[in-house]
Amino acid sequence: MIVLDASAAVELLGDTQAGKKIAARLSTERVLHAPHLLDLEVASAFRSHSALGAVDAERIAQALALHRKLPIMRHPHYPYLDRIWALRHNFTAYDACYLALAEALGATLLTRDKALASARLQRGNVEVI
C-alpha cells in the first residue's frame, strides 16, 4: 500500500526522470492513498513552476488532467490532527499529514523529500525515490 506525497506526484505528473522511476515503482499498485492536501500541494507546485516560466500553461493543464485520473483514494486529515501535532518538532504540518496517514494505514510513504526519510513511523515506512 502506497501513500503518495506531493513531491512524488509532481515528478510523476511532470514526466521527469524521477517521475519515470516513480511510475515504475507504482506500476503494480491498483490504488494509491493520499490526504486531501495532495491536490492543493500539487496545484501550488505547478503554480510555482508556471510563475517561474519553467512549465507552460498547456503542459500544466495536461498534468492536472492526468492528476485527476490517477487512482488515488483521498483521506481527510482531520482524524490525524493529534499525530500531526505530535510530529511538529521535526516536520511541518503538511509533511506530518502524509506521515500520519502512512502510519495509520501501515503503508509506505513514497516521496522525493529526503528530510522525510528520518521519520520513524509506528507502522509503515518512508521510501525516498
Which role fits each region the language model picked out?
Residues L4-D5, L32-H36, N90-A93, D113, ...:
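Histidine- and aromatic-rich ligand-binding microenvironments
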Residues M1, L99-I129:
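Acidic, PIN/NYN-like endoribonuclease modules and their adjacent C-terminal/linker elements
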Residues E11-L13, A45, A119-R120:
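Residues that scaffold the ATP/ADP-binding catalytic core of kinase and kinase-like folds
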Residues K21, E41, R83, S118-A119:
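Phosphate- and divalent-cation-binding pockets in alpha/beta enzyme and binding domains
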Residues M1-L38, H49-A61, K114:
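Short, well-structured N-terminal submotif of metal-dependent ribonuclease cores
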Residues T28-L32, H49-L52, H67-L70, L87, ...:
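Alpha-helix C-capping/helix-to-loop hinge sites
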Residues A43-I72, R83:
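Active-site-proximal, substrate-binding regions of enzyme catalytic domains
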Residues L70-R112:
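Active-site neighborhoods of divalent-metal-dependent phosphate/nucleic-acid chemistry enzymes
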